[in-house]
Amino acid sequence: MLEIIFEDDHDAAAFLHLIQHSDDRNNIIVREGIRKIGIEKANPAFPIQRFMEPILVKFFLECKEDEHMLSLIEETYCFTDQDEQQQILQLAHSIIEGEADDLPFEPLKLSRKQSILDELQTICLEEGVFYIRSFQTFRLGSYYKQLRDITEAAIDEYKMEQEYQNFIQTLRDYVDAKQPRIKKVHIVHDGSFTLWELRYVPEREKMKYIDRRFVRDHPMYIDSHLLAPLISIAPDEVVLYTDQPEHMMARTIQNVFQERVEMLPLHAFTDAEIPVKHSEG
């Protein structure tokens, strides 16, 4: 018989649930104890090792992984607010599932599973005693290194998102406090973004529209081509023509100007509908 020892009743119950939903459940006999589960063969020819490996992998990935990352988030990186912890954890999930852009973690789903399986295959799971905590402590170093890297990347992403949200709020406050220099502007996104009212204005003249002090205070985020003049003009209405509403710049314009923005598909744009000369507000 193989006996598995758990740290608490919750882990034992979670593991038992995985066993009960296994396709090979009828090939084994389960004996329940206090924080332990015994596994015996119902069929003498059935290998317990083959049965246990995928269940243990699933247990560590589905039942213990979030617990470990939350422990890192709180105890190692000192995020004690539960809402913040959950936001970081969700970002970690996005990284694991490959949903986060520009992060070098594409093969993680496979490698995490393989890291655990490789260690399980070095020990005998046909009989004896298997301690969950000991296996975590002494065998899963490579796997936990991956989780630490994922957690650090998620925290970096979270901090960047917080900075972005603070920046957006700063732009909103700035725009709300200004009188519009042009009442209505049109932005055309066709490969690049063009502020249509200023398309024929010389670069030197465009600089007159830009609040240089504000741009100087936010150099990392404000580009001089579009966002700087747009924010400085502070229009009452922004018509944005784009076929990519999820583009970062399109989202930024929406987030800053909110209800002032009307977003239309690119094919709806016609130059003839826009006055050649703009009117000062």
Curated annotation (Swiss-Prot):
InterPro entries: Spore_YtxC
Protein name, per record: Uncharacterized protein YtxC
One Pfam family here: YtxC
Natural source organism: Bacillus subtilis (strain 168)
Highest taxon of source: Bacteria
